[in-house]
């Protein structure tokens, strides 16, 4: 990933927060000379050293985990927004401005392995459910479904673990603009009712 220093974020707490809010990862591995790309939610351990998730047993990622080259990259996509040059004060002064795109992503690289343990898989799925259900003010739990059905569904999946080798963020949030232009972006984002632009605004207001 192209990563200018002023966009680089290494703080684990900041990276973990984005991953927690946007857990759906684009997971890329190499299988027989071609890229194997999947999309799945992952959970980061508190120490930032491991990711856990689950996939269908028929997913080609199983073969990726079983081969010698088990290196994968997980990409987490946070807020993103088109930034119009009309928001820059310098547009009126010189006209020397162009559009750009602000965004925040986290890249994790590491080795993929499988966890084929029924007890672990059940515990993992329960943990993931308990983590995300409160967002919808719901108290649904795995135990609410018929046990026979749960067992059938759990048998169809396998756990995965990624041992993190590197974890870095790229938060392109207009840091390379002048203070007045940065302020212009923030002020105009504040006027927008669009959810994605509000998410970008919240991120720009956080200390990086």
Regions found by a protein language model. Name each.
Residues 1-208:
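Binding-site signature for planar aromatic cofactors or substrates
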């Amino acid at each position: 990933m192209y990563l200018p220093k002023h966009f680089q974020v290494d703080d684990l707490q900041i990276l973990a927060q984005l991953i927690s809010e946007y857990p759906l990862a684009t997971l890329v591995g190499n299988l027989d000379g071609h890229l194997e790309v999947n999309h799945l939610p992952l959970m980061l351990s508190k120490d930032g050293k491991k990711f856990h998730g689950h996939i269908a047993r028929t997913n080609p990622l199983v073969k990726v985990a079983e081969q010698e080259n088990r290196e994968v990259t997980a990409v987490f996509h946070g807020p993103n927004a088109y930034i119009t040059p009309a928001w820059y004060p310098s547009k009126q002064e010189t006209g020397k401005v162009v559009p750009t795109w602000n965004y925040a992503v986290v890249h994790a690289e590491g080795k993929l392995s499988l966890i084929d343990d029924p007890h672990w898989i059940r515990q993992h799925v329960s943990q993931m459910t308990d983590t995300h259900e409160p967002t919808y003010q719901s108290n649904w739990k795995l135990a609410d479904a018929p046990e026979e059905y749960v067992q059938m569904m759990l048998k169809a999946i396998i756990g995965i673990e990624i041992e993190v080798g590197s974890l870095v963020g790229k938060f392109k949030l207009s840091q390379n603009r002048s203070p007045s232009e940065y302020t212009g972006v923030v002020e105009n984002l504040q006027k927008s009712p669009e959810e994605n632009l509000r998410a970008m605004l919240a991120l720009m207001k956080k200390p990086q």
